[in-house]
Regions:
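Ribonuclease/tRNase effector modules and their secretory precursors
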Residues: 1-92
Length: 92
């Protein structure tokens, strides 16, 4: 996962370290499509929201962008998962 300085700053403002965000990928997670935005905005097609847990058990939701390299994601931002997002993970 790649993260820009802006993404690291956004995570930090929410009390999430980049290492905590990366831990989520090695634990159980689900990926949902980004439903925000209009059909005219490309974000809707290239952004995904992985929902999972860090090693400490904290539920996180990240916003990632698909890159030209299929095994590499660009981290945009993230937050502590909402109750609805946690439910998506638990039901998966």
């Amino acid at each position: 996962m790649l993260a820009t300085e802006a993404a690291i700053d956004k995570l930090g403002a929410r009390g999430i370290s980049i290492s905590e965000a990366e831990q989520m990928i090695w634990n159980r997670y689900v990926v949902i499509r980004n439903r925000r935005g209009s059909a005219a905005r490309p974000q809707r097609n290239i952004r995904r929201l992985p929902i999972g847990r860090s090693d400490s058990g904290r539920f996180l939701t990240l916003v990632i962008e698909v890159t030209v390299e299929p095994t590499t994601w660009l981290l945009i931002t993230g937050w502590e998962s909402t109750p609805a997002e946690r439910m998506i993970l638990m039901k998966a």
